């Protein structure tokens, strides 16, 4: 499987603090960005399989939207233990957003990836969640993957942030009350693009929506049998929801595409109250509060890039 490697521009954490503080202030009423020790992510509300997101950071984009749209390509299935080896980091902790492993589940879903991949010293741990449309009432069904399934698959497309899963220094971002039009992730990504221009910066991590509600979507359980050829077609196919805090989100974003047909940002979320899906934006700007922990990635790995592409279905 084709895998291209690219070295990101990697600013210091201190420099990123200043850049993000300035950019976020244009979009949120209260902004506080600082360098801190990564909190213990095994604790609530994160409940990740590892304590941190530090060490040999990298972003992987696997597959892509053209394997889902206009029509699904069901040959495009992946294994996260193999991906960890492809990105030169066997045993990596991988988090991110992707399509659920329909090859195991038997249906399509939103996937919130949290996987400690296998290494010589320890077996893999799958802390991932998946969200599907409830066939009974059209609501959200969120489940922990490992409660029923024991593989490490994903499918079609995935945007991943990988590291050694170590404790260490990270960027903490606290914002309250959205005053601008951009969602939290888009604001950070566009801030980086504006500042760094043609020097692409990649970031990932985790954030909590502590107060408020957000617009999300979940893909239908059945892949579309008729071609979806535009954002309008896709939006008619998706199921949209308003979900309530607290939500744990898994963002992966890149300031500018260095020529790999990247999805520039992709964020999925889960909760401990049965809601989860693909994050779009908060719907309660006057009360929303975000708290996040982020790191820049050293490398980009582009795995199984689609040869034929298009630009829709990436919101």
From Swiss-Prot:
Pfam families named among the record's database cross-references: DUF1907
Q: Which subcellular locations apply to this protein?
A: Nucleus
Instruction: Decide whether keyword Hydrolase is in the record.
Output: yes
Ligand binding (Zn(2+)): 266, 268, 278
Chief site of localization: nucleus
Q: Which UniProt keywords apply?
A: Hydrolase, Metal-binding, Nucleus, Zinc
- GO molecular function terms listed in the Swiss-Prot or TrEMBL record: hydrolase activity, acting on ester bonds; zinc ion binding
| One Gene Ontology CC term in the entry | nuclear body
Which example biological process does GO assign this protein? Answer: regulation of DNA repair
UniProt EC number: 3.1.-.-
Taxonomic superkingdom: Eukaryota
SUPFAM superfamilies in alphabetical order: AF0104/ALDC/Ptd012-like
Q: What does this protein do?
A: Exhibits ester hydrolase activity on the substrate p-nitrophenyl acetate.
Q: Indicate the quaternary assembly.
A: Monomer.
Checking PANTHER family in the record gives:
ESTER HYDROLASE C11ORF54, PTD012 PROTEIN
Q: What is this protein called?
A: Ester hydrolase C11orf54 homolog
- Organism equals Bos taurus
């Amino acid at each position: 499987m084709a895998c291209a490697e690219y070295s990101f521009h990697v600013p210091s954490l201190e420099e990123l603090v200043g850049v993000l503080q300035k950019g976020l202030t244009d979009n949120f009423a209260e902004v506080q960005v600082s360098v801190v020790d990564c909190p213990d992510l095994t604790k609530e509300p994160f409940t990740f399989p590892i304590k941190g997101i530090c060490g040999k950071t990298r972003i992987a984009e696997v597959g892509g939207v053209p394997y889902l749209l206009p029509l699904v390509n069901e040959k495009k299935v992946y294994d996260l233990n193999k991906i960890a080896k492809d990105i030169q980091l066997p045993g990596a902790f991988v988090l991110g957003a992707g399509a659920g492993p329909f090859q195991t589940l038997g249906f399509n879903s939103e996937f919130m990836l949290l996987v400690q991949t296998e290494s010589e010293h320890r077996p893999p741990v799958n802390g991932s969640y998946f969200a599907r449309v409830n066939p009974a009432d059209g609501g959200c069904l969120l489940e922990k993957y490992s409660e029923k399934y024991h593989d490490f698959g994903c499918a079609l497309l995935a945007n991943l942030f990988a590291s050694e899963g170590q404790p260490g220094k990270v960027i903490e971002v606290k914002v309250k009350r959205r005053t601008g039009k951009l969602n939290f992730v888009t604001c950070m990504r566009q801030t980086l693009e504006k500042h760094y221009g043609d020097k692409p910066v990649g970031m990932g991590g985790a954030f909590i929506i502590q107060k408020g509600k957000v617009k999300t979507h979940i893909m239908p359980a059945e892949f579309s049998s008729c071609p979806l050829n535009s954002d309008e077609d896709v939006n008619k196919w998706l199921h949209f929801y308003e979900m309530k805090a607290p939500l744990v989100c898994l963002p992966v974003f890149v300031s500018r595409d260095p020529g790999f047909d990247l999805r520039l940002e992709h964020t999925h979320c889960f909760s401990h109250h049965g809601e989860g899906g693909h994050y779009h934006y908060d719907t309660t700007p006057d009360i929303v509060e975000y708290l996040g922990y982020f790191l820049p990635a050293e490398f980009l790995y582009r795995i199984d890039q689609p040869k034929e592409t298009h630009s829709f279905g990436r919101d």
